[in-house]
């Protein structure tokens, strides 16, 4: 595996590779990330990964400097997965001058859910992903469903800019007890780690309530409120539990709900000092 930090060197290395499959990450890799590499291999060749901790997507209360950086361990993991090139630029490589141009997602998708609680986050994500796409010029890019809203935003960005890239969604990888794998899990205390699977069970409870009752009399806002209250009773601090349409992450109308519109339940909640997100499609 070749490790590259220069944008020009990356382009030179990939020249003529018109089937490249790309997996962007911020490093600190775990099994969930590695599953993305394996899926990428099924959809393209060669597999190209990136590791870049993107300052633009960190808010004022989010510590960019404390984000775990484990490059050597990450390199070993990617080598074992047969990744062809790792693009690991420095901040100077990616932003040699102030990044004055930004890619801002539409407000109806970028300012809800995660966007409401992390202002500017998706603007930072879209800007760096667009730049990474420009650097790697892949045919395929793989994004995990765990970051469901991010997946939707990147997919729409690719469509609206007519980028010749297929966005492939990857299923969330979970521990045996259901907790979604995340770099943030390392911050959980033993007691918090034992409690953490409750978040996924809450999503299942919401799904069972929605699917098990009479749709004509269902009150989705009340279902969401009860789920938030249940988490609060266990010591969580939920930002949201939201039942949304898969297609655009807007709340379904009663007519859409009764017609069987495909839905997804999304949640974000703090357990102690650690903020976890998860989702479940209905």
UniProtKB/Swiss-Prot annotation:
Subcellular localization, as worded in the UniProt entry: Cytoplasm
Main location: cytoplasm
Top EC class of this enzyme: ligase
Reaction(s) the record says it catalyses: (R)-pantoate + beta-alanine + ATP = (R)-pantothenate + AMP + diphosphate + H(+)
GO molecular function: ATP binding; pantoate-beta-alanine ligase activity
Protein name as it appears in the record: Pantothenate synthetase
Assembly and oligomerization: Homodimer.
Database matches in Pfam families: Pantoate_ligase
Organism name: Cupriavidus taiwanensis (strain DSM 17343 / BCRC 17206 / CCUG 44338 / CIP 107171 / LMG 19424 / R1)
Annotated gene: panC
Function: Catalyzes the condensation of pantoate with beta-alanine in an ATP-dependent reaction via a pantoyl-adenylate intermediate.
NCBIfam families: cyt_tran_rel (TIGR00125), panC (TIGR00018)
Active site: 33
Residue numbers binding beta-alanine: 57
Keyword annotations from UniProtKB, A to Z: ATP-binding, Cytoplasm, Ligase, Nucleotide-binding, Pantothenate biosynthesis
Note: The reaction proceeds by a bi uni uni bi ping pong mechanism.
Positions that bind (R)-pantoate: 57, 150
Matches recorded under InterPro entries: Cyt_trans-like, Pantoate_ligase, Pantoate_ligase_C, Rossmann-like_a/b/a_fold
Keyword Oxidoreductase: no
Protein family: Belongs to the pantothenate synthetase family.
GO CC field: cytosol
Example of a GO biological process term: pantothenate biosynthetic process
């Amino acid at each position: 595996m070749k490790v590259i930090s220069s944008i020009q060197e990356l382009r030179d290395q990939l020249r003529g590779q018109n089937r490249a499959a790309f997996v962007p990450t911020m490093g600190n890799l775990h099994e969930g990330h590695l599953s993305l590499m394996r899926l990428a291999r099924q959809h393209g060749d060669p597999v190209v990964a990136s590791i870049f901790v993107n300052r633009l997507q960190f808010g004022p209360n989010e510590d960019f400097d404390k984000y775990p950086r484990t490059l050597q361990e990450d390199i070993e993991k990617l080598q074992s997965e047969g990744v062809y090139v790792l693009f690991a630029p420095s901040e100077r490589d990616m932003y040699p001058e102030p990044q004055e141009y930004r890619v801002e997602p539409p407000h109806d998708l970028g300012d809800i859910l995660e966007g409401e609680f992390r202002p500017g986050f998706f603007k930072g994500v879209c800007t760096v992903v667009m730049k990474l796409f420009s650097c790697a010029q892949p045919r395929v890019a793989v994004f995990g469903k765990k970051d469901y809203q991010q997946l939707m935003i990147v997919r729409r960005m690719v469509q609206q800019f007519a980028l010749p890239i297929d966005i492939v969604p990857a299923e969330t990888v979970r521990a045996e007890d259901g907790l979604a794998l995340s770099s943030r899990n390392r911050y959980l205390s033993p007691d918090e780690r034992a409690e953490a699977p409750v978040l996924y069970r809450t999503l299942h409870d919401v799904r069972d309530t929605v699917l098990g009752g009479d749709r004509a009399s269902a009150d989705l806002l009340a279902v969401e409120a009860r789920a938030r209250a249940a988490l609060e009773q266990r010591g969580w601090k939920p930002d949201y539990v939201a039942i949304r349409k898969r297609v655009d992450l807007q709340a379904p109308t009663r007519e859409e709900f009764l017609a069987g519109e495909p839905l997804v339940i999304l949640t974000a909640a703090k357990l102690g000092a650690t903020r976890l997100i998860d989702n479940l499609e209905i």
